[in-house]
Swiss-Prot record:
The gene is groEL1. It comes from the Bacteria. Keywords: ATP-binding, Chaperone, Cytoplasm, Isomerase, Nucleotide-binding. Residues 530-542 have a biased composition (Gly residues). This is Chaperonin GroEL 1. The keyword Chaperone applies. PROSITE patterns: CHAPERONINS_CPN60. It is found in: Cytoplasm.
Length: 584
């Protein structure tokens, strides 16, 4: 495809247009008086959101070079969302201001590389000051942080606080849709571990990039799976039952993984696979814990068990399993509660008998995972649109609260950034030329979140910032008053602010030091098929054999079915089989 090139100030100006296009749409979503953004969906009702990352991802700009700028600032929002779970709008606002100020100075003759250095020096100073101002989160502050992150919604703050209190920081909190109008909290058995799906093709929710399995059957083994030949009988039973299926194994690779993906994508089997957590003996112990939680039998060669011996009775089950790219959460049924309790007691006895402090710590980690349980926040609403909106708000609030527990909190409403901005003045005055200008770019950007919070609440941002400096108090956008925000419970998680600053400086500096932008030249739309007087639909090509389920079953090589080598059967349209080597 032919490319178009843009150079120097021309490229930077086009990139800035893209940045402004996205940032102006995103920044209305910050603060307690934030506004909503309505997003059209091709199918179903439109989404109403107040989340910077979601808004940024939806925006495409016709000009290819400007669209590159839009994608860069989208990267800021998505990276902050991924790392902190919140703070995407703050990061976007900071980036926009740094880009605007930086480009003004470059147009006046400043060196982009020196500006970048100055911005990095300023960032290091800001992060040091931010850390020094951070305070640990006390139990009573959890609800305050959750409420602020939920846009001042007291109900959401209360539910998250209760959930945190019950399952503690070692437990798991998940958010799901409720069939009722009320938002409720339910505590059940479950756990999570740090392993994600083996392939992104297992994802069931493309927007959130998660795989969700409702009432799945679960195979747990400490063996490596590279072929599905031994599992064909059990896979056939699973397919007939219509149950989702999770394979948790030491590893699943090669032909086995490819075959599962193809069968998943062709609708033959709702399946996913996850590598077992940890390593060595600790891995086996973790698999035993998960087996007890789910009522499964651990298929292990140590117990003289092989995969071809697996029956439906050896499989575990769960209410729901949610898998992201790096984490798996299991919500278990209550009927394993006594088994889990007995397992925890056994592990506690092991701790008492173990002299190694390291081993004691690791066993205690297992106890915490098993005993912590899972808190289910069931989101109720009158309409599907409201349901999606509330669910997003709760997820953001939950992420912010977890971040606050990790690294503490600072005064909210942008007050801490304003204080640090004033302290940057001394550093700036000690620097020279473009380095000083780079520091000042960061200094000015630190004021922007508060200005936008004030603007969204109907106040003049410049006036509000001036009053904050004069009174040495923060601005409560809910009441329109200047207060001690820590006493008022208006707190921001330090981690969220830190990551927003780091990500915004990183992307802004990259954009300011860009000299050439390269993008595809859009191709003209193709003429309608069929030609004058012809069928506008064209003709339908012949279809290959569909290989529908039941044609030969899921048997061994030579038989129709799951798509093993040499097999015909349940292939995708136009294919005799699943597309594996040697398939008919």
């Amino acid at each position: 495809m032919a490319k178009q090139l843009s150079f120097s100030n021309e490229s930077r100006d086009a990139l800035e247009k893209g940045v402004n296009f996205v940032a102006n749409a995103v920044k209305v979503t910050i603060g307690p008086k934030a506004k909503n953004v309505v997003i059209e969906r091709k199918f179903g009702s439109p989404d109403v959101v107040r989340d910077g990352s979601t808004v940024a991802k939806e925006i495409e700009i016709e000009n290819p070079i400007s669209n590159l700028g839009a994608k860069l600032i989208e990267q800021v929002a998505s990276k902050t969302k991924e790392s902190a779970g919140d703070g995407t709008t703050t990061a976007t606002i900071l980036t926009q201001k740094m880009v605007q100020e930086g480009l003004k100075n470059i147009a006046s003759g400043a060196s982009p590389m020196e500006l970048k250095k100055g911005m990095e020096v300023g960032l290091a100073f800001v992060l040091e000051k931010l850390s020094s101002k951070s305070i640990s989160l006390s139990g009573s502050d959890i609800q305050k942080v959750a409420t602020v992150s939920a846009g001042g919604d007291q109900e959401i703050g209360s539910i998250i606080s209760k959930a945190m209190d019950i399952v503690t920081s070692d437990g798991v909190i998940t958010v799901e849709e409720s069939q009722s109008l009320d938002t409720e909290l339910d505590i059940t058995e479950g756990m999570s571990f740090d392993r994600g799906y083996s392939s992104p093709y297992f994802v069931t929710d493309q927007e959130r990039q998660v795989c969700e399995l409702e009432n799945p059957k679960i195979l747990i083994t400490d063996q490596k799976i590279s072929t599905l030949a031994n599992l064909v009988p059990i896979l056939e039973e699973i397919q007939k039952s219509g149950s989702p299926f999770l394979i948790l194994a030491e590893d699943i690779e090669g032909e086995a993984l490819t075959t599962l993906v193809l069968n998943k994508n062709s609708g033959v089997l709702n399946v996913a696979s996850v590598r077992a957590p940890l390593f060595g003996e600790r891995r086996k112990a973790a698999l035993e814990d998960i087996a007890i939680l789910t009522g499964a039998k651990l298929i292990s060669e140590d117990k003289s068990m092989t995969l071809d011996q697996v029956s439906i009775n050896d499989l575990g089950k769960a209410k729901k399993i949610t898998i992201t790219k790096d984490k798996t959460t299991i919500v278990a049924f209550e009927d394993t509660k006594d088994l889990v309790k007995a397992r925890v007691e056994k592990l506690k006895r092991e701790v008492e008998m173990t002299e190694s402090e390291y081993d004691q710590d690791k066993i205690n980690e297992r106890i915490a995972k098993l005993a912590g349980g899972v808190a289910l926040i069931k989101v109720g609403a009158a309409t599907e649109t409201e349901m999606k909106y509330k669910k997003l708000r709760i997820e953001d609030s939950l992420n912010a609260t977890k971040a606050a527990i990790e690294e503490g909190v600072v005064s909210g409403g942008g007050q801490t950034l304003i204080e640090i901005s004033d302290e940057l003045l001394n550093l700036s005055q000690k620097s020279s030329d473009d380095l000083r200008t780079g520091i000042n770019i960061v200094k000015e950007a630190l004021l922007e979140p508060t200005k936008q919070i004030a603007k969204n609440a109907g106040f003049n941002g410049d006036v509000v910032v001036a009053e904050i400096k004069r009174l040495n108090k923060g601005f409560n956008a809910n009441s329109g008053k200047y207060e001690n925000l820590k006493e008022s419970g208006i707190l921001d998680p330090t981690k969220v602010i830190r990551l927003a600053l780091q990500d915004s400086v990183s992307i802004a500096a990259m954009l300011l030091t860009t000299e050439v932008a390269i993008a595809d030249i859009p191709e003209p739309e193709a003429a309608a098929p069929g030609g004058p007087g012809g069928d506008p639909m064209g003709g339908m090509g012949g279809m290959g054999g569909m290989g529908m389920p039941g044609m030969g079953g899921m048997g061994m090589p030579g038989m129709g079915g799951m798509g093993m080598p040499g097999m015909g059967g349940m292939g995708m349209p136009g294919m005799g089989g699943m597309g594996m080597p040697g398939m008919m």
